[in-house]
Amino acid sequence: MVVEDTQKSSITDDQITANPNNENEDLEEGEILDDDDSSATSRPPSSSGALARNPHPLENSWTFWFDNPSAKSKQAAWGSSIRPIYTFATVEEFWSIYNNIHHPSKLAVGADFHCFKHKIEPKWEDPICANGGKWTMTFPRGKSDTSWLYTLLGMIGEQFDHGDEICGAVVNVRNRQEKIALWTKNAANEAAQVSIGKQWKEFLDYNDTIGFIFHEDAKKHDRAAKNKYVI
């Protein structure tokens, strides 16, 4: 499980994993939020009064980003359709947002949903990401919801020994599969990347082999880029 063993964060495991009642299960496919999400905001959907009065701060603030498949075809430059949705800084804000957004299985094919540390953009060109890379896991279509949640909890709960290396994560929804990628900032630090990859597999109880690709190689070779680390 994601947050059972490590005690790095000052927030307890129960506080991270305590999920208030899910408030919305009726979003239309392809939508992220149940109300108008046309503008980015740092204010999440309202938390319950009791939780809001006693917030549990996270070590880092995080921002959800969405790349709408319907907008991609209208954009000339790669990445220009990615937009921030919400920024959260407490456990309560995270659950308030998570319970009001679609999970990967309900997103339209072609959608990309990101969660990155605040002020880091989910792009190769971002200075923090430029020298990094990513681990990637693959799932059958509609089967990544739980692994996506556990990935988020592992990141925001600071459960990785090399958490400072982590930039964020993205889930890509495609016709036949879904992919979750964990982005890191210093690809050349093999020890840190291997540690992150191993812990991620443990958190998700993922048994297949995963590979790590440098962003620089991905930019040069696209899909022909080869894994530098494999576990």
UniProtKB/Swiss-Prot annotation:
Lineage, top ranks: Eukaryota, Viridiplantae, Streptophyta, Embryophyta, Tracheophyta
SUPFAM superfamilies: eIF4e-like
The name this protein goes by in its record: Eukaryotic translation initiation factor 4E-1
Changes seen on gene knockout: (Microbial infection) No significant resistance against peanut stripe virus (PStV). Plants lacking both eIF4E and eIF(iso)4E exhibit an increased resistance against PStV.
Compositionally biased residues, Low complexity: 39-48
Subcellular compartments: Nucleus; Cytoplasm
Region EIF4G-binding: start-end pairs: 56-59, 66-102, 150-159
Gene Ontology, cellular component aspect: cytoplasm; eukaryotic translation initiation factor 4F complex; nucleus
One GO-annotated biological process of the protein: defense response to virus
Family stated for the protein in its record: Belongs to the eukaryotic initiation factor 4E family.
Primary localization class, coarse: nucleus
The protein's assembly and partners: EIF4F is a multi-subunit complex, the composition of which varies with external and internal environmental conditions. It is composed of at least EIF4A, EIF4E and EIF4G. EIF4E is also known to interact with other partners. In higher plants two isoforms of EIF4F have been identified, named isoform EIF4F and isoform EIF(iso)4F. Isoform EIF4F has subunits p220 and p26, whereas isoform EIF(iso)4F has subunits p82 and p28.
Cysteines paired by S-S bonds: C129-C167
Primary role: Component of the protein complex eIF4F, which is involved in the recognition of the mRNA cap, ATP-dependent unwinding of 5'-terminal secondary structure and recruitment of mRNA to the ribosome. Recognizes and binds the 7-methylguanosine-containing mRNA cap during an early step in the initiation of protein synthesis and facilitates ribosome binding by inducing the unwinding of the mRNAs secondary structures. Key component of recessive resistance to potyviruses such as peanut stripe virus (PStV). (Microbial infection) Susceptibility host factor required for viral infection by recruiting viral RNAs to the host ribosomal complex via an interaction with viral genome-linked protein (VPg).
Gene3D superfamilies from the UniProt entry: RNA Cap, Translation Initiation Factor Eif4e (3.30.760.10)
Pfam families: IF4E
Tissue specificity annotation: Expressed ubiquitously with highest levels in young leaves and roots, and lowest levels in flowers.
